[in-house]
Swiss-Prot record:
Cofactor binding note of this UniProt entry: Binds 2 [4Fe-4S] clusters. One cluster is coordinated with 3 cysteines and an exchangeable S-adenosyl-L-methionine.
Family: Belongs to the methylthiotransferase family.
Keywords: 4Fe-4S, Iron, Iron-sulfur, Metal-binding, S-adenosyl-L-methionine, Transferase
Protein's name according to its UniProt entry: Putative methylthiotransferase jhp_0270
SMART domains named among the record's database cross-references: Elp3
Domain MTTase N-terminal span(s) in chain numbering: 2-110
Residues involved in [4Fe-4S] cluster 1 binding: 11, 45, 74
GO MF terms held by the record: 4 iron, 4 sulfur cluster binding; metal ion binding; N6-threonylcarbomyladenosine methylthiotransferase activity
Keyword Glycosyltransferase attached: no
Amino acid sequence: MKKVYFKTFGCRTNLFDTQVMGENLKDFSATLEEQEADIIIINSCTVTNGTDSAVRSYARKMARLDKEVLFTGCGVKTQGKELFEKGLLKGVFGHDNKEKINALLQEKKRFFIDDNLENKHLDTTMVSEFVGKTRAFIKIQEGCDFDCNYCIIPSVRGRARSFEERKILEQVGLLCSKGVQEVVLTGTNVGSYGKDRGSNIARLIKKLSQITGLKRIRIGSLEPNQINDEFLELLEEDFLEKHLHIALQHSHDFMLERMNRRNRTKSDRELLEIIASKNFAIGTDFIVGHPGESESVFEKAFKNLESLPLTHIHPFIYSKRKDTPSSLMRDSVSLEDSKKRLNAIKDLIFHKNKAFRQLQLKLNTPLKALVEAQKDGEFKALDQFFNPIKIKSDKPLRASFLEIKEYEIKERENHAVF
């Protein structure tokens, strides 16, 4: 039986998609060791030029090693054809064909199968286990109806559509029966869940919370305008992780308008302050170096960031994507300036995060941590605020949910003895 190795680039949605493909392998076996694989399946990402480059490099490397390489994911529409025509790939297939992986692997001839995004395809595969066992990523929707000027993803994932609630509940129930204790709800635009089905993400979360064995629910990312009063009521519930990732993308209205974003700084501040008042950690995304971000604009944006109750951030440098409105804008920002701004933001939120952790210690807040791994004599876990904690213990703590009352604050994580 030939062995298949999955190389996954990009987001949590791609991780779930890889699990879907793995579940559909019938005449092949999956391996975690790249070198022993006969076939490499690249599940690609195309969110930035950097990810495109990393994907290309990996495809070339595998081709040089004389591996049989299949290519799928968001990169199919941006560089799949180019890599295929160069002879680096045995086959290319779009998102709609993941569940046909077993048949595709048996194809004798080279093939190129793209998606028709008008089909609004949704997978039906039930994932029976998840790598990592205790935490699982659950895709609840696909696609995005937002039209942000810088973003290429709607053109490769299609418009927003939601999985059936019954299927999601069944999927989570199955995984929890096999030891999963925490789920991370993911998708292209998670907060849009239910819009096409007369429901919403708050109602889904309430039903998920009733599943036996599920101890914590985490949400991948939300848009500010998707958080309504019904969702805010959930902040009082113990089953929801005390951390929300809210995609602001910038903290200056001029840039938000430039990006064709739906949020604005005043309402963003009001929302974040409400959430922070519930003792929640708050993360966000932030794009630096988008066309139009002058020095004065960034300085004002940075001051706004300083005053926001943020604890985590995923900042990245604007990446020019072909055929997006932003790619046609001329007032670009130098890479040197972009890097300086990126580092300034990272440093700011690093100190905010440490201050938040110190506050929790002062308030005698116990950390509720899910232990995921053991390395170098220490256990690694994530607490309810999405902060890492290292735990020294002689006990078999793997896959345990702990309440830690005594801990130390270190530079980048908390430490404890249990």
